Design a protein with these regions (language model features):
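A conserved ligand/cofactor-binding region detector
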Residues: 1-805
Length: 805
């Protein structure tokens, strides 16, 4: 069926009448948004049926992408764009008496992720669909998801984010496809005619109800699915207890089941929190694998060819239990031998690593497994025993055996489980993958070198250029056509316009318009007035010490002190924009947020800074905010300690929108530098190798005593600002350490270099032609960071599936 403005109008009116019992004149903005979503969902559902039939008929290998996060953002505009119906939908909404912009703004961000991990998964699902790869994403249908951030008295406060209130229009519940998950209990085993018989009894049951969210590809009828699992208790309320007035007790089991899918990353600094997190991970993995294997048996009648028709990509270690759970299904349910099951598993599962931080490599206490997952624990023990024997036979080195162990000294190491049970392990940037091979997983790489790969991250360039920055999209189309939407490498054709004054002038005008648009948004959303004549200098990302928001703050303090010393100095206006959420239990990160707000209050209220220096903390940073901010940004701060950031994807989105990078040679910045050169970005700081060498004899206090600028800046932390809050704890942490080495992320070591690079940024900005030319080169050379390229790499080197070229 062909859809146009009129057919969409009629379909929307029908949805309003049938689902809300109202006319278009009576409908609220929320009802209109949901009606539009339902219309697009119906179009995708029809195409999805056709996609699944083709996949089954042609017996194609299917990719299953498991991630505890999918940061989808808003879907109404995105799906309309991919279906190539955005103009028609916008017109239909307008003719029904609504402003399309208001309707799009009504949609909440889907609260299914926290940061880069979840946004990457969302971009990849889009590209898998656009490239017509049969695929499905799997996660948990979090009721509240990641928290909504509120800044109260300068401090982060976490509020529940009830995104499902309006976001459920995209979900298609499938209760008939529910799976049952077992926790606790005990396991009995016996041998019967050479077969191990396993009986799991006295367990607690939880139902996993699938809620499917359809994903449309661009310029294709192919539709894939994101399956989200909702946890429910199969037991009805205990009416006897309820009638006795024991209301909480009567609901106890239901509440425990519901808690599994309530919130993303519950705090785990206590036993109950750890237990809930492990329950979440097994719930999600077990439901997913039961669903996948059930569908496979329906199609092929056996699991012996499972690995030939399925590949399971796990996004970080959160879904690592897919390895023992697949073994359980193959052995206990399908009756295969251990060796048969292990061969299938080892050819089905691939693992993407996202961190080199030792503290972020996931591990669990053994007793949790023994209590919550007794059968999985038995299988884990056997995996660990066999893997340890393999390592012993290869290295004959007890230290290497300990380092590579799946289970050691009462602790389960999930990354080692992924290495032992997976067919491939990949990093997400060239530098990151090199560090994994040379350092983090050096011994495993020495034993199985062919298992280790690199697939540099990418982002959905259709969303992060064309959809969110229509002015830039128009310029690109006028210069090189629209072929870049499906072949991002064609953006390189823009390089030939670097000497075209009209193109550069138009690019500058687009950036100025986007700054004005973001300023209006910020005024409306946060009541802050931005100086649009200033450089928009932006750092937005999860708050973590290694990402070094604090280094940015130290530099801003130094600028403020310069203005205090000489209010009449020649000063290029700068507006520093921060956006970041801190994990609820991460006290240091929360202190840094408070420091940013203290500094903002001081600077923004000081007359000497007016129209010169401004600091703004953007509350509740999220995908929809990024979509407004990135087109308006001029400087992208990517300043993590070299060797600590796996890749980053925000750096790529800023690059695509023409912001210039101020950064270290870390993560994907290294590959950005390879295509841009020194002349099109602003590098500073130690390299990863230099940082590693410095740590052996690092004395931050020596830098403090020798550098008067740094000395004065750090002393300001102790003194604090006009709100009377002292940050001596951060001062002490940098100079003397606390629960960590002093200045473990080398802020002070890179401070002088960072300040010098920041000065180069300001000097270069004054030359508008040069700046605009650099901006154009950034856009032109960003095509390599398209998620389409990343997915093609996965398809070619790990999944071995065909895709649309």
């Amino acid at each position: 069926m062909t859809y146009n403005k009129e057919t969409l109008k009629n379909a929307i009116v029908q949805k309003l009448r049938l689902n809300y019992g109202c006319t278009e004149q009576q409908a609220t903005d929320g009802e209109m948004m949901k009606a539009c979503a339902m219309v697009l969902r119906d179009i995708m559902a029809e195409r999805g049926v056709q996609t699944r039939e083709e996949t089954a008929h042609e017996e194609k290998r299917k990719v299953h992408y498991l991630s505890l996060e999918f940061l989808m953002g808003r879907s109404l505009m995105k799906n309309a764009f991919n279906l190539e119906l955005l103009d028609e939908l916008t017109a239909a909404i307008g003719e029904l008496g609504f402003r399309a912009a208001d309707i799009f703004d009504m949609e909440p961000d889907a609260g299914l992720g926290n940061g880069g991990l979840g946004r990457l998964a969302a971009c990849y699902l889009d590209s898998m669909t656009t490239l017509e790869i049969p695929a499905a994403g799997y996660s948990i249908c979090y009721e509240l998801g990641i928290f909504k951030q509120k800044i109260v008295d300068g401090q982060q406060v976490e509020l529940p984010d009830d995104w499902l209130n309006l976001g459920d229009a995209w979900l298609m519940p499938k209760p008939q496809e529910a799976e049952e998950i077992h926790f606790g209990g005990r396991v009995r085993t016996r041998w019967d005619n050479g077969h191990l018989m396993v009986v799991h009894e006295d367990y607690t049951r939880v139902l996993a109800i699938p809620c499917d969210m359809l994903v449309a590809g661009y310029n294709t009828d192919h539709v894939n699915t994101l399956r989200l699992w909702d946890a429910k208790s199969p037991k009805p309320i205990d009416m006897q207890l309820f009638s006795q007035g024991q209301y909480l007790k009567a609901n106890e089991e239901r509440a425990m089941a519901d808690s599994i899918s309530t919130i993303l990353y519950p705090e785990d600094n206590h036993y109950e929190g750890k237990s809930l997190r492990l329950k979440q991970q097994y719930f999600f993995v077990s439901a997913t694998l039961q669903s996948i294997t059930r569908q496979h048996i329906q199609t092929y009648g056996t699991l012996k060819n499972f690995h030939e028709k399925n590949v399971i990509q796990i996004n970080d270690t959160h879904p690592a239990l897919v390895i023992p759970e697949l073994m359980r299904i193959l052995i206990d349910d399908a009756g295969l031998s251990w060796d048969e099951a292990w061969d299938i598993t080892r050819h089905s599962v691939a693992y993407t690593n996202h961190t080199v931080l030792a503290e972020a490599l996931e591990s669990w206490p053994q007793r949790l497994f023994e209590t919550l997952l007794p059968r999985i624990w038995q299988i884990m023990q056997e995996i660990a025993r066999r893997w340890q024997q393999k390592v012993d036979d290869f290295y004959h080195d007890p230290k290497k055996t300990e380092k590579m162990a799946v289970i050691w000294d009462g602790v389960v190491h999930m990354a080692n489980l992924c290495i032992a049970g997976g067919m491939a392990v990949n990093g997400v940037s060239a530098l990151h993958s090199d560090i994994l091979r040379r350092d983090v997983f050096r011994d495993a790489c020495g034993m199985e070198p062919d298992k280790f790969r690199n697939v540099t991250n990418g982002v959905d360039h259709r969303r992060w250029i064309s959809q969110i920055n229509p002015g830039l999209d128009g310029l690109i189309r006028d210069c090189i056509g629209d072929g870049y939407l499906t072949h991002a490498g064609r953006l390189s054709d823009l390089d030939r316009f670097a000497g075209d004054a009209a193109v550069l002038s138009r690019l500058e005008q687009i950036k100025g318009d986007n700054k004005q648009a973001f300023a209006r948004w910020a005024k409306r959303q946060q009541g802050v007035t931005l100086n649009t004549d200033a450089i928009f200098n932006v750092q937005v990302k999860r708050l973590h010490e290694y990402k070094r928001q604090l280094l940015n703050v130290l530099h801003i303090i130094s600028l403020y002190q310069q203005l205090q010393d000489d209010p009449n100095m020649d000063f290029r206006p700068q507006t520093f924009l921060f956006g970041a959420k801190a994990a609820p239990g991460y006290a240091v990160a929360k202190r840094i947020i408070r420091l940013i707000n203290s500094l903002a209050d001081q600077i923004n209220s000081d007359p000497i800074c007016r129209d010169k220096l401004q600091v703004v903390f953007l509350e509740n940073y999220r995908v929809s905010m990024a979509e407004m901010l990135m087109p308006a940004s001029e400087v992208s701060q990517q300043i993590s300690t070299a060797g600590k950031e796996a890749s980053g994807t925000g750096n790529m989105k800023f690059m695509m929108n023409g912001a210039l990078t101020l950064g270290t040679l870390d993560g994907a910045n290294v590959e950005m530098h390879q295509v841009l050169g020194d002349e099109n970005m602003f590098l500073f700081g130690l390299t990863a190798d230099e940082a590693a060498r410095l740590r052996q004899s690092y004395d931050p206090h020596l830098l403090y005593t020798r550098d008067p600028v740094l000395h004065r800046v750090l002393d300001q932390l102790k003194t604090g600002f006009r709100d009377g809050v002292s940050y001596e704890d951060l001062y002490q942490r940098l100079l003397y350490g606390a629960d960590c080495p002093a200045d473990q992320y080398l802020l002070l070591a890179d401070f002088a270099s960072y300040c010098a690079a920041s000065h180069r940024v300001v000097d270069t900005y004054a030359d508008r032609e040069k700046w605009n030319r650099m901006s154009l080169h950034n856009i032109a050379r960003s095509g390599i960071f398209s998620a389409d390229r990343s997915i093609a790499d996965y398809a070619d080197t790990i999944w071995h599936v065909p895709y649309k070229k």
